[in-house]
Amino acid sequence: MNYVLVQIAKRYLCITACETVGEAAANGTANKGNSKKQADPNEKKAYSFSSPLIIPVDKAVLKDKSSVWEDPALLARLVKDGLSTMNHSEVRDVILMVESYDLTCQEYQHIRGAKRIIEGLAIDRIRDFVGEAASDFSVIYKDYSTYKTKEVNEEITSKAFAMPKALADDLVAGFKSFSLNLIQIIPSEAAMIYAAQKTIYSFNKTVALISMDYSAVRVFIAKNGVPLYCHEFTSPVDEILQ
């Protein structure tokens, strides 16, 4: 396995090991006599996933903390121990999937423009919430457009996601202290928007996607290939189990 996906809920961690699968394995055929063939950057990669491991995070684990976000080193140790339990101690690269309720988020509308301009708009929307402290946040955005229309003044909806830079730095340092590399922090909603644009067939119809796991309930609506609505709620799984 090459990577571990880490999802964080209030009382649980969900970790899943994964790896990219070679062309021969993905196609189910051997690539004999063609070992020097260059990879096609447009070719869709295939992945193999382990069974998820659910790690309880209770008061005994947190001690005087209210969540693992307050102790990145604890989060890293739990992931490290989880990989050992899964017999995947060889994994070093970590992808952290963050739910929107743990981020500062804001939807906004804009017309098509240069990437740097749209990024500036995203920062402005976050500034509406955090004021001048916006410079202390790392901000990314994901637009809902499929870029299949060419209207210059078409109004597009985007969503900005922000995390304190200091927290991101502490997370990197925390994982590094356990010989793990935090290579990416991804908002789960951004991943869902991307997936809907690429994989959900919604042309000439409206499609609703509802996902519930230990981390969140995610509601997503797409129409004619364009995402219309995306929102996350705290998962009720823990309350159901109680």
Show which residues each predicted segment covers.
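Small-residue (GG/TT-enriched) beta-loop-alpha framework at ligand/catalytic clefts
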Residues: 2-24, 42-43, 47-50, 152-242
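Phosphate- and other anionic-substrate recognition elements at nucleic-acid/protein interfaces
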Residues: 24, 29-42, 47-49, 73, ...
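N-terminal phosphate-binding loop and adjacent alpha-helix
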Residues: 37, 44-85, 241-242
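Internal amphipathic helical hairpin motif
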Residues: 72-73, 98-158
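Phosphate-interacting basic helix/loop segments used at nucleotide- and nucleic-acid interfaces
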Residues: 73-87, 191-192, 199-204
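Solvent-exposed alpha-helical segments within well-ordered globular domains of core cellular machineries
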Residues: 77-84, 120, 124-128, 169, ...
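Short secondary-structure junctions
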Residues: 88-89, 130-137, 177-180
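Short glycine-rich phosphate-binding loop at a beta-alpha junction
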Residues: 88-101, 175, 184
